[in-house]
Structure formats: structure tokens, C-alpha cells
């Protein structure tokens, strides 16, 4: 099923600017001072997940969906020794900024949600809806 141009948040796949494994390592280093990867395969999986295709169609067609897939992969799978949830939030912030969007995260307001993501209490669609509520165009 094609999503066509139905959604404002549906970028052309070639125009999306994704984070790399190096970007994630740098974010975790800035947070913890010493990025220690628990599982390098999970790191590469987290980087690839927002780009997934299912029967030739993006599994996550919106920027919020791609950001949610990234957040879930980082927070839930605990691929770093420390700073997974903080890295997940920063990864979403940087991914959206690279793609012309501002992410409004307030630790006092939003920390419980991120903790719940880390415990596996929300699916990717719910995470995407939460991110969408906190997104606005840069500028």
C-alpha cells in the first residue's frame, strides 16, 4: 500500500537525512564521556531501522515514524553501557533537526514516557504520535 502524498510528514525517501553509527557514538560520548557499546550489531540495526522497507514500501513513512523507530531501538535495546535513554532523546532531536524539524523535549514533562519506551510499554506507532505532538518546522 502506498502512502502517496497523504501526509505532510511524509518525505521522499531520498530526501531524508539519517543518522550514522558514528553520529550515535558521538551523541553517547557527549552524554556519558565514554561511549561503550554493549552490542555493535544492535548499533547498526538501530541505524538501519528507520530506513526499513516492507514489500518495497517504507515501514516508517513519516519523519515521526522514523524518529520513533530510532528512539525505540536505542532506548529499549540498551545497546550502550550507559546513557541509552538520553542518547535516544538526543538522537531524535538531531535526526529531526537534520530534516528541518524542531523537537520540543522537556525532561520534567517527558522523562516518564521515555522510561516507558525503555521498558517496552509503547509500540512504534504510539511513540511516533508522541514525537509528532512535539515536532514543529524549524525556522
What do the predicted segments below correspond to?
Residues 1-139:
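FIC/Doc superfamily catalytic core
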Amino acid at each position: 500500500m502506498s502512502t502517496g502524498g497523504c501526509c505532510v510528514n511524509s518525505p521522499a525517501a531520498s530526501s531524508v537525512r539519517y543518522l550514522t553509527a558514528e553520529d550515535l557514538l558521538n551523541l553517547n560520548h557527549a552524554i556519558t564521556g565514554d561511549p561503550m557499546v554493549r552490542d555493535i550489531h544492535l548499533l547498526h540495526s538501530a541505524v538501519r531501522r528507520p530506513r526499513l522497507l516492507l514489500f518495497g514500501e517504507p515501514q516508517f513513512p513519516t519523519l515521526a515514524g522514523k524518529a520513533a523507530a530510532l528512539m525505540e531501538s536505542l532506548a529499549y535495546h540498551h545497546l550502550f553501557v550507559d546513557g541509552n535513554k538520553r542518547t535516544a532523546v538526543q538522537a531524535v532531536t538531531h535526526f529531526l533537526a537534520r530534516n528541518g524539524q524542531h523537537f520540543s523535549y522537556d525532561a520534567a514533562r517527558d522523562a516518564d514516557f521515555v522510561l516507558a519506551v525503555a521498558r517496552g510499554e509503547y509500540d512504534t506507532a504510539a511513540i511516533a504520535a508522541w514525537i509528532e505532538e512535539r515536532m514543529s518546522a524549524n525556522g
